[in-house]
Regions:
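Short, contiguous, well-structured surface segments enriched in hydrophobic/aromatic residues
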Residues: 1-86, 108-109, 144, 159-166
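Polyanionic, low-complexity intrinsically disordered segments
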Residues: 59, 69-97, 103-218
Length: 218
């Protein structure tokens, strides 16, 4: 039920050997805000007491994105959801991109590095193969951590977002960014073969899965 799995997860968090009360402390920091206080004032939230009996739909409202991924992993393993367990590695890469963006880090640095040697999930390979991206190009681009993270984010968005309205808005944003803002001074990069090849790579993905002809997609 919607309470049991959260209780189990918070029990694990409270008694974790390496990082005890990590999720509890994160929740405790948030409940002071007026937004969260309306929902969580009915719970006895104390940073030194184990939190219990919060339904999953309210629990998901207050945890951070990284804690959501950890909870997803716990949930998938608890219920032996093999397909979902395989997504954990994809989500971990997305967390890295999210953290970089949240801290205003430059996400376009070090695009020439080959710093990710882990084999990508077969679902990602199929996703890219459907874009007519050759194996050597896939291997080359996914060997860069940042390109891999952006690729995984685009893939997972396509997999889990079901709202037509959200999809339409995000697809419009992607097209405006990729074919508008990024192209506004493309002459600056005429001699930069690395950036041109990366642009071509993402161009194929966007044209396949995020076409500006939105009604055909959603």
């Amino acid at each position: 039920d919607g309470y049991r799995i959260v209780n189990m997860y918070l029990e694990k968090d409270f008694n974790d050997e390496k990082f005890p009360k990590k999720v509890l402390k994160s929740i405790f920091k948030k409940v002071g805000s007026s937004y969260y206080d309306k929902v969580f004032s009915k719970y006895d939230i104390d940073k030194d007491k184990k939190l219990e009996y919060i339904p999953i739909w309210e629990f998901l409202e207050i945890i951070t994105f990284v804690d959501l991924v950890y909870f997803y992993e716990f949930f998938a393993k608890e219920y032996s959801m093999d397909k979902e367990i395989k997504n954990i590695f994809i989500f971990r890469e997305i967390v890295k991109l999210r953290n970089a963006v949240a801290h205003n880090s430059c996400i376009l640095c070090d695009l020439d590095k080959k710093d990710n040697t882990f084999a990508p999930d077969y679902k990602i390979l199929t996703y890219l193969n459907n874009c007519n991206i050759r194996k050597d190009t896939r291997d080359n681009k996914l060997s860069n951590s940042r390109i891999r993270q952006i690729t995984y984010t685009l893939y997972m968005f396509n997999e889990i977002v079901t709202s037509k309205g959200i999809k339409k808005n995000i697809i419009e944003d992607i097209n405006n960014l990729f074919y508008g803002r990024i192209n506004s001074h493309k002459e600056y990069y005429n001699n930069n073969e690395l950036l041109k090849s990366i642009y071509t790579y993402f161009d194929k993905i966007i044209k396949k899965y995020y076409s500006s002809d939105i009604d055909k997609i959603v």
